[in-house]
Structures are given as structure tokens and as C-alpha cells.
């Protein structure tokens, strides 16, 4: 039995394309709205930030997510894990 959400599994199961920011696990309407206000309107835009900040230290991305849109630790973990798994499959 998997411990990831259906939202996570759906996101990592296919190429990202033009998916909205809210398609990412851990990002709902409220956080998505805050990120959109900062120009992060699509999942691929947030992926860019993830790749810039990550480089084998995803705590930087999680901290940035908490600071930039008020994500809590669980939301930041879910989003980071989702992007990390997507990268493993598609990059």
C-alpha cells in the first residue's frame, strides 16, 4: 500500500505539460493563489525554482516554500517529494 496521495500519484504518472500549480501535492487553492501572485502559476514554473534551489539539498526549496507562501512543513514536504519523484521519472 502506497503512502502517497492520489494527487501525488496522478502528478508523477505523466509529463507535466501545462498543469496548474494546484496539481502538485501539498499545494491547494490558498497556497496556489499565493504562489500565483508571485508569478508561479504553473507547475513547471515551480519546478524551475525547485531545480534552482534543490541541488541535492531540498531543505532550501522547502524553506523557500514556507517563506514565500506560508506553507507548513507537511505541505512543503509533500510538494518537494512530488517534484523529486517527477524529476526521477522524467528528467
Curated annotation (Swiss-Prot):
GO terms for molecular function: DNA binding. Coiled coil: none annotated. GO terms for biological process: chromosome organization. GO terms for cellular component: condensed chromosome; nucleus. It is found in: Nucleus. Pfam families: SAM_BAF. Homodimer. This is Barrier-to-autointegration factor-like protein. The lineage of its organism: Eukaryota, Metazoa, Chordata, Craniata, Vertebrata. The gene is banf2.
